[in-house]
Amino acid sequence: METAHAPVLAPGALPLLGHALALSAPLRFLRSLPAHGDLVEVRVGPLRAVVVCDPALTHQVLLNDRVFDKGGLVLKRGREIAGNGLGTCAHRDHRRQRRLVQPAFHRHRMPHYASVMVRQASEVMNAWRPGQIIDVLDEMGTVSIRSIAAAVSAALPPGRADSLIADYFSLEQVLYRRMLTPPPFDRLPTPGKRRYDRARARLQQTVQEIIAVHREGKPDRGDLMSMLLLARVAPSDTDDGRRLSDREVSDQIVSFFLAGAKTVAETLSWSAHLVATHPEVRQRLHAEVDTVMSASVPLYGDLHRLKTTENIVKETLRLYPAAALTRTTTTATELGRYRLRAGTTVVYSPYLLHRHPGLFPDPEHFRPERWLSIPAADARAVYLPFAAGPRKCIGDTFGFMECTLVLAMLAARWQLEPVGDSDSSPVFGATLRPRRLRMRLIARTGTEDEPPASPA
């Protein structure tokens, strides 16, 4: 039997700094690591992490959440905002929370959520005008956070939705920098830290107010908040079936806002960029939406026929998924032929996996048609935009549906044209966003207001 050994240290580590200088070009550094081994150690100052570069070992990490629990700097910063929500809680709390939250994302709820998404996207797009230059990420962020806010609570006043949008952007701008700021420097009262603290407090206060309104009114308003407040499961050997507390409900909602809005906004922005820069794909997309949709507003019932749109979203998520996510070992263990101590930060990268030439031929190129020939079972093994295993994103269907519906609506109404000062280079964080994506709107149809879509 082969003896387990420690992961190899990535080359270029400097005294005290570790790989901090190499990480000034983070994606280049990340993509250099597989050449050095299946597990590679990275250091930044006093921080240590092991990056998993092998697909099979990545799946072992994701499937065994008891040993490879949620943890690391990404999760530490996430917990500052989202507390002990489903996306940030430890293994010991996860099963109970998952059982309680799951009904809110049952497939029979999706038609209602779809109508909410389409209505919110229509309101944003109805304000656009031909020839206008938009910041695509800002606009898609507005669509996404408004959609989540409306899906969460039918009782949310419009002014509160606007404040949620502002607070979301404030938190998103600072969060990645805080992930890489070691203690005690993360507690210094810098202007960014003060903005972060104020936005975090306002967001949590808004969610508490929404909960209070729901507690006082009718128990089921048909929204996600109602489902969480009413959720209860039968007692089992591992939990007593208690409802979610108000604090737990608040943590879930804040998690949905932060994780869901960011992922959807960035995916839609990258999709718009990729469609605009690939004319043959744009032509196929326009032909599909013109054929499938009776108006410029898609319906839930159109989804199964929007295959080109769906494949564009899939391919976008392949090229621009999460860059680096973390787990922490709860005990000493072995991963493949490597030994890991308890408390080791383990980094896995959907970005690395999705650009592996042995898994995806011609991996650097945008080819939505590749998904016509990839069996679903094969995709599940190598395609991880929403992770995998027990901690797979609970909102994967919700988020993918929103991306598909909004992209279809965008393509039906507008053609987007990049402008000169646009910069589509990816900015590294837990996820990847375009640096500056400005595009000119060219109308394909009239821009008059569309009626709200029904959930049919």
Predicted regions and their residues:
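Cytochrome P450 I-helix active-site segment
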Residues: 6-13, 114, 118, 166-170, ...
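Conserved cytochrome P450 K-helix E-x-x-R motif and the immediately C-terminal K′/meander segment
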Residues: 14-37, 205, 209, 296-336, ...
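Cytochrome P450 heme-thiolate monooxygenase catalytic core
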Residues: 1-5, 70-76, 93, 109-266, ...
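Conserved cytochrome P450 K-helix/beta-meander segment immediately N-terminal to the heme-binding cysteine loop
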Residues: 67, 348-375
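Cytochrome P450 proximal C-terminal region
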Residues: 121, 144, 169-170, 290-295, ...
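Cytochrome P450 catalytic-core helices
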Residues: 263-288, 397-414
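N-terminal membrane-proximal hinge/A-helix region immediately C-terminal to the signal-anchor transmembrane segment
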Residues: 1-96, 111, 115-123, 158-159, ...
